[in-house]
């Protein structure tokens, strides 16, 4: 499902008419958070979440944070519900044996970097990770889930889109009002280029009373140069156009783009159609790292993947906060 366009436009007729439903949604979120058990486990828990529905860069943030913790010698595990997967868990994901259909694409991608537990019951997932030797947990997308207590919360936001029209689902893109959500945040990380960061700071900066980090998603080099390469690109992520723009910035000659729904299954029928279309155009099929893990092996070899990694302008405030919860 694609987000309605009016979510990211100044409040108009549609968002105003839907505002009462948004108020009910916000009340439900507040009640769930207020009455949740907030169980504490025996190791520090770092929550990476957002206030917006949809993609904001949580997975690249989790990967980058995990790499920093692992470099410090911390045995860090990820706990996620495995959105889009079939497994209830708790299950430690094996990158080479599990599929995105079983555990979800985000969990499968995370498992390439750190031990990752899928569990619809986050408490059970956390306990399983601790029993397996985890010294610290990264809780993926748990900001509005009251099952676990966490020691540090990082709210990730797309700098271009910000908090949209500032209204709650279905009137806008938010899971809860900005001023309420940010009161629970310890750090805000906005991701995007300089122009987007300036726009975000101008529009939303006054709402942020905690350390505000900025960063960008930078593509990693691939074996095949993209400059001048004829490309048919597809992406089933929160904001596909960001990926297409990344390809353009690398010099790719985009002959066609296909914006799929977030987490959309990549069926044989769909992939055969895309590959046939690319062949007729003399183009290379290119996709994101998160989409690539949903491909079956027979198609994965025919599709070029462009991975991205988070680069933060100043890790200092986050490093200090992490060291504090780790007792260092």
Swiss-Prot record:
EC number: 2.7.1.130
Keyword Cell wall biogenesis/degradation: no
Pfam families: LpxK
GO molecular function, one term: tetraacyldisaccharide 4'-kinase activity
Keywords attached to this entry: ATP-binding, Kinase, Lipid A biosynthesis, Lipid biosynthesis, Lipid metabolism, Nucleotide-binding, Transferase
Record's catalysed reaction(s): a lipid A disaccharide + ATP = a lipid IVA + ADP + H(+)
Pathway the protein contributes to: Glycolipid biosynthesis; lipid IV(A) biosynthesis; lipid IV(A) from (3R)-3-hydroxytetradecanoyl-[acyl-carrier-protein] and UDP-N-acetyl-alpha-D-glucosamine: step 6/6
Enzyme class label: transferase
GO annotation, biological process: lipid A biosynthetic process; lipopolysaccharide core region biosynthetic process
GO cellular component: plasma membrane
Binding-site residues for ATP, renumbered to this chain: 52-59
SUPFAM superfamilies, per database record: P-loop containing nucleoside triphosphate hydrolases
Family: Belongs to the LpxK family.
Function: Transfers the gamma-phosphate of ATP to the 4'-position of a tetraacyldisaccharide 1-phosphate intermediate (termed DS-1-P) to form tetraacyldisaccharide 1,4'-bis-phosphate (lipid IVA).
Designated name of the protein: Tetraacyldisaccharide 4'-kinase
């Amino acid at each position: 499902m694609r987000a309605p366009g009016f979510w990211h436009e100044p409040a108009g007729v549609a968002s105003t008419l839907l505002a009462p439903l948004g108020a009910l949604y916000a009340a439900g979120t507040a009640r769930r958070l207020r009455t949740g058990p907030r169980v504490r486990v025996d190791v520090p828990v770092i929550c990476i979440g957002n206030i917006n529905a949809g993609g904001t860069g949580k997975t690249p943030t989790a990967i980058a944070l995990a790499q920093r913790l692992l470099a410090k010698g911390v045995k860090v595990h990820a706990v996620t519900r495995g959105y889009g997967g079939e497994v209830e868990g708790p299950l430690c994901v094996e990158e080479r044996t599990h599929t995105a259909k079983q555990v979800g694409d985000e969990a499968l991608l995370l498992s390439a970097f750190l031990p990752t537990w899928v569990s619809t019951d986050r408490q059970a997932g956390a306990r399983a990770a601790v029993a397996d030797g985890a010294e610290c947990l990264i809780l993926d997308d748990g900001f509005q889930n009251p099952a676990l207590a966490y020691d540090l919360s990082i709210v990730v936001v797309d700098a271009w889109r910000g908090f949209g029209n500032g209204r709650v689902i279905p009137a806008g893109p938010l899971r809860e009002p900005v001023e309420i959500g940010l009161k629970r945040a310890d750090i805000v990380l906005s991701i995007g280029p300089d122009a987007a960061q300036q726009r975000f700071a101008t529009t939303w900066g006054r709402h942020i009373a905690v350390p505000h980090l900025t960063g960008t998603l930078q593509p990693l080099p691939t074996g095949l140069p993209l400059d001048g390469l004829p490309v048919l690109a597809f992406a089933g992520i929160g904001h596909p156009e960001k990926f297409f723009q990344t390809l353009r910035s690398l010099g790719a000659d985009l002959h066609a783009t296909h914006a799929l729904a977030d987490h959309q299954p990549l069926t044989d029928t769909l992939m055969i159609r895309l590959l046939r279309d690319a062949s007729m155009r003399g183009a290379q099929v290119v996709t994101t790292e998160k989409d690539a893990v949903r491909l079956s092996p027979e198609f994965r070899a025919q599709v070029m993947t462009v991975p991205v990694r988070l680069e933060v302008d100043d890790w200092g405030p986050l490093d200090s906060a992490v060291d504090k919860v780790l007792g260092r």
